[in-house]
């Protein structure tokens, strides 16, 4: 996908060396934006293998989000991608689906005079009776059907009181549906974007979500827009990271098409052997040397969104290059 390749190039060309909480250094840039036309096929990257277990994990994760579960006990039956952030009982400090489907609403006694809040017709009470919540997914679906031209089809996973202390607050924190010329578009805001590991998943996941919602509201899909606040590429630790800090201007050569030369120089000159693949730059350069193939398509069963199961979503005509390995910074 050309848009993804350009993201890599622009980050290497314009990015800054930046430390972060993980201890693995990054090349980072601020406020990167791009669009993908969903009418041109499903945006699953073709310059590396993303079917098999990767596709399965992405679909199971999205369906888990839509379930509204705050734990990973059911998700663990199909993928382990959230295991590192859960406690021994499978509970998460922050779960996207919990806020998508059960965003807390203050009880009336806690509301300030003059404020406007949803009424009992719009919210639900938790089975424990301890709190009220609004189902944001159902709200936007109903709102798109009733008032498609509204600019308020917003879903957020960010709760400040949770995010302030969470081990991993939401990275892709808010998305907005917008209807133009009868087509359903989706815009995602992402505060932190791991270009090698996370972004390919995020593109596919929100494209699939857009298809699911579009089917629910009986509209064709339009465009996926993506805003990356901190778009970054991990470049290793210790001496290897220091080498990138001292040679960051060399990375700009990628914009001039000197990809093979730059890749060879890094492999020869950067300290360490990168056995843990925490330096993502060499394999991203390898990916840039590959030509994108025609995008695949998807088929979705004719079911309500809350009844969709994994087997109801089929990936079709997917051509791809070989796998590339990238370490995950936790």
Regions found by a protein language model. Give the residues of each.
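Terminal, non-catalytic protein-protein interaction segments that mediate quaternary/complex assembly
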Residues: 1-330
